[in-house]
């Protein structure tokens, strides 16, 4: 089946047809590194990591570019307020974003260009726009002229006369609708030499130049948060048109993380930093939560919703841990016991439908429930093979979403949830099995009080006992 994605520009689902067969080129607007990241910032990283994973699962080679905006009005303001050099402020928060992406298991991009490293490319791009009659320099600033650019407004659907670029009038602007590509130097601010005088980049020219530098004049998909649709992405596309580039063939935008119906943002003061949220759940559980809603939907944050998502992930994790013990007879968490298998056709069908993750997760949990029923039966060779096949399907599906509990990224977390180190787990297994033997003897003698006492004591210690056809099994709660 062909992947269909919602193209913001077309306002409809479109079949994904890459420019080059077997290859996908993607540009994601990355972080403006002005502050530590909150969960709203990293949702796009998770959402489009899932896109990348799915394209790769379908056999495509993916070139994935995610930029860093390391020079910006907000960065300069924050650095000045904190009496820090702008470059140090930007570098500190770039590291914080990369830490957050790593914590959430987001695959590193093919390349992560910084704006400050691409000023020559921006200068060349602006010169092309000026030469083509769509831009001009005035008092050290360089402006683009939307009124002269074909199809301006195609992405946001706004009319030119009604647009607000969110800029001041600007020195030398010929038309208030023009937007800034390059800002003239100001005292105390970083500046670079250009044919029009010293200055620094505007926000929009950075991405147009970096995207085409690495992906060419035309590429497959441009991604980013819904809040970037206008003016940023509209102006990126306009600059590309003005320069003579085809630019992105598909535009994808993810919804916001909201609190009480409002977008999570520093200005509203309703942010939840990644370190603070990770005090409530494990990194993989936060990733599961951020990826669990459809990428175009708003994701309303609450601790209850976060907890429900974490519980959903743990059901998958617990099934795989139990499946390993069922197949091997050992409690050690060994991923090789359950090789990654084939994905069910129903899962692929849901993912091909504009990355319908909620429905895809429903498929995973249906398969987990099927597997759990088998785990309650006596472990015959035939039953073990069935469990391996089902577990392999679960792993394959979870891997696409970046939440396979037995993957290298999450294996240590899974081992810890299953009881810590192999040595500690082995010791605990001996002790618990001794208690379970005492309980079995009590049950055989119809000493129900003692049997219940053993079970209750184990429960108080965080150990859950499940009676199966092959005897009592135990696992750690939560």
Swiss-Prot record:
Q: Which UniProt keywords apply?
A: Aminoacyl-tRNA synthetase, ATP-binding, Cytoplasm, Ligase, Metal-binding, Nucleotide-binding, Protein biosynthesis, Zinc
| Domain of life assignment | Bacteria
Compartments (UniProt record): Cytoplasm
Q: Which InterPro entries match?
A: Cys-tRNA-ligase (IPR015803), Cys-tRNA-synt_Ia_DALR (IPR015273), Cys-tRNA/MSH_ligase (IPR024909), CysS_C (IPR056411), Rossmann-like_a/b/a_fold (IPR014729), tRNA-synt_1_cat_dom (IPR032678), tRNAsynth_Ia_anticodon-bd (IPR009080)
- What's this protein's name? Cysteine--tRNA ligase
Under HAMAP family, the record lists: Cys_tRNA_synth
Q: Which GO terms describe its cellular component?
A: cytosol
Instruction: List this protein's GO terms for biological process.
Output: cysteinyl-tRNA aminoacylation
Please name the gene that encodes this protein: cysS
């Amino acid at each position: 089946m062909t992947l269909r994605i919602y193209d913001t520009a077309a306002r409809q689902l479109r079949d994904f047809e890459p420019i080059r067969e077997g290859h996908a080129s993607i540009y994601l607007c990355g972080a403006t590194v002005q502050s530590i990241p909150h969960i709203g910032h990293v949702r796009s990283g998770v959402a489009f990591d899932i896109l990348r994973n799915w394209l790769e699962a379908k056999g495509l080679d993916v070139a994935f570019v995610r930029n860093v905006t390391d020079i910006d009005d907000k960065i300069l303001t924050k650095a000045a307020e904190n009496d820090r050099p702008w470059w140090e402020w930007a570098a500190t928060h770039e590291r914080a974003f990369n830490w957050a992406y790593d914590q959430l298991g987001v695959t590193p991009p093919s390349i992560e260009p910084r704006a400050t490293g691409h000023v020559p490319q921006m200068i060349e791009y602006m010169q092309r726009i000026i030469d083509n009659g769509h831009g001009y320099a005035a008092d050290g600033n360089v402006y683009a002229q939307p009124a002269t650019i074909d199809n301006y407004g195609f992405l946001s659907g706004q009319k030119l006369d009604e647009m607000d670029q969110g800029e001041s009038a600007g020195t030398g602007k010929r038309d208030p609708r023009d937007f800034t590509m390059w800002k003239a130097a100001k005292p105390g601010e970083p500046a670079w030499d250009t044919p029009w005088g010293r200055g620094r980049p505007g926000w929009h020219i950075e991405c147009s130049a970096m995207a085409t530098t690495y992906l060419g004049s035309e590429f497959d998909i441009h991604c980013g948060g819904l809040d970037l649709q206008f003016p940023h992405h509209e102006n990126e596309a306009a600059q590309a048109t003005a320069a003579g580039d085809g630019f992105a063939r598909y535009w994808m935008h993810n919804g916001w993380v909201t609190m009480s119906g409002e977008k999570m943002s520093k200005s509203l003061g309703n942010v939840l930093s990644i370190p603070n949220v990770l005090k409530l759940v494990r990194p993989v559980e936060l990733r599961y939560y951020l990826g669990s809603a459809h990428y175009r939907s708003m994701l309303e944050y609450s601790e209850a919703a976060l907890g429900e998502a974490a519980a959903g992930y743990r059901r998958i994790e617990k099934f795989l841990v139990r499946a390993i013990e069922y197949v091997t007879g050992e409690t050690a968490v060994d991923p090789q016991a359950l090789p990654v298998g084939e994905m069910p056709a129903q899962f692929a069908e849901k993912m091909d439908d504009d990355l319908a993750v909620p429905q895809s997760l429903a498929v995973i949990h249906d398969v987990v429930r099927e597997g759990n029923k088998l785990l309650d039966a006596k472990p015959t060779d035939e039953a073990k093979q069935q469990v391996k096949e089902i577990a392999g399907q679960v792993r394959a599906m979870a891997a696409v979403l970046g939440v396979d509990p037995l993957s290298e990224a999450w294996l240590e977390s899974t081992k810890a949830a299953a009881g810590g180190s192999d040595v500690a787990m082995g010791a605990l297994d001996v002790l618990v099995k001794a208690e379970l033997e005492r309980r079995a003897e009590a049950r055989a003698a119809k000493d129900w009080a003692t049997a219940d006492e053993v079970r209750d004591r184990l429960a108080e210690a965080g150990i859950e006992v499940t009676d199966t056809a092959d005897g009592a099994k135990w696992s750690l709660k939560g």
